[in-house]
Amino acid sequence: MKREYTEIRESVKNNMEKNQREILAERFEFRQILPQEADQAVEMEQICFPPHEACTEEHMKDRIEKAPSLFLVAMDRETGKLAGLFTGLSTNEDTFRDEFFVDADLYEPEGKNVMMLSLEVLPEYQGMGIARKLVEEYCRREKENGREQLILTCLDAKAEM
C-alpha cells in the first residue's frame, strides 16, 4: 500500500513538473537579451533589488553591450515584456569579487567560469517557476559553452546557514 502511494505521488509530481514546463514554454520565451530590452532590465533590477544593491543603469547597459550572451531572459509572449532575467560574467578567475558587479571590462569571453550576478523575476510573475527555469537553462547553456563553474555570491542575511 505504501509503495503504491509513493508511486502515485511520484507520478503526480512528475506530471505536475511536466505540465509546468509546458506552460512555461508556451507562455515565455527563454533567450538572450536584446539591446532594445536594456531599459526593461534596468527597471526590473530597480524593482527587484533595494537601491543599495541594484545595478545602476550605466552598469547594466554596459554589461548588456559587452556581454549580451551572458544574459538569459524570460519574455512573456502575451505582453512582449521581460518577466525575469539571469545574468553573469565569464572570467578565468576562480574567486568572486565585488568588482564583477560594476566593471564589465572584467568580462572574458572565453572564461572558464561564470560569476553569477543577478537572478530576478518581477513580483507579478513570482511563484510560476520562472526563476527555476532560468537557472536550469542558464546552467545547461553555459555547460554547453564549455564553462567549468558557475560561482554565486550571496549576502549573509539572505542565505541563512
What are these regions (language model features)?
Residues 81, 85-119, 126:
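Conserved acyl-donor/pantetheine-binding loop and adjacent beta-alpha core of acyl/acetyltransferases
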Residues 27-41:
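A short beta-loop-alpha structural element at the N-terminal edge
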Residues 70-74:
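Hydrophobic beta-strand residues of extracellular immunoglobulin-like
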Residues 1-21, 93:
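Acyl-donor-binding surface of acyltransferase catalytic domains
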Residues 135, 142-156:
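Conserved GNAT acetyl-CoA-binding A-motif
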Residues 33, 119-121:
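Hydrophobic adenine-recognition pocket in adenosine-nucleotide-binding enzymes
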Residues 43-56:
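Helix-loop element at the rim of GNAT/NAT acetyltransferase active sites that forms part
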Residues 121, 127-140:
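Conserved acetyl-CoA-binding loop-helix of GNAT-fold acetyltransferases
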